Structure formats: C-alpha cells, structure tokens
Curated annotation (Swiss-Prot):
The chain crosses the membrane at residues 4-24, 45-65. It comes from Staphylococcus saprophyticus subsp. saprophyticus (strain ATCC 15305 / DSM 20229 / NCIMB 8711 / NCTC 7292 / S-41). One of its GO terms (molecular function) is lipid binding. F-type ATPases have 2 components, F(1) - the catalytic core - and F(0) - the membrane proton channel. F(1) has five subunits: alpha(3), beta(3), gamma(1), delta(1), epsilon(1). F(0) has three main subunits: a(1), b(2) and c(10-14). The alpha and beta chains form an alternating ring which encloses part of the gamma chain. F(1) is attached to F(0) by a central stalk formed by the gamma and epsilon chains, while a peripheral stalk is formed by the delta and b chains. One of its GO terms (cellular component) is plasma membrane. The keyword Manganese does not apply. Pfam families: ATP-synt_C (PF00137). Belongs to the ATPase C chain family. This is ATP synthase subunit c. NCBIfam families: ATP_synt_c, PRK06876.1. The record marks E54 as: Reversibly protonated during proton transport. InterPro entries: ATP_synth_csu_bac/chlpt (IPR005953), ATP_synth_F0_csu (IPR000454), ATP_synth_F0_csu_DDCD_BS (IPR020537), ATP_synth_F0_csu_sf (IPR038662), ATPase_proteolipid_c-like_dom (IPR002379), F/V-ATP_Csub_sf (IPR035921).
Amino acid sequence: MNLIAAAIAIGLSALGAGIGNGLIVSRTVEGVARQPEARGQLMGIMFIGIGLVEALPIIGVVIAFMSL
C-alpha cells in the first residue's frame, strides 16, 4: 500500500509541475510577443517561477521516499 501511495504522490506532483511549467512558459511567450523589448526581464522572471514550480515535485519525491 505504501508503494501505491508513493507512486501516486510522485505522479501527481509531476503532473502539477508539468501543467505549471506549461502555463508559465505560455504566458512568457505571450508577454514577449506583446513587448519584445521586455524579453530579458520576462525570461528572468520565468526562470525564477519555473524553479519554484519544480521545487514542489522534488519535495514530493523526497516525502514519498521517506514514507516507504
């Protein structure tokens, strides 16, 4: 039962991160299309956002392995 719970936790955290990263990148592309001169600033903010979104699945994996 613990293995199933760990697999579900890892899968859902990866799914959430994928959706979050897709939304962040799509909004950044829209912003660059509207204001090309703000590309550098938008890319920096995008990378910070992606880093924060990717931290959650890593924490989820660690918690899943700790529960085994």
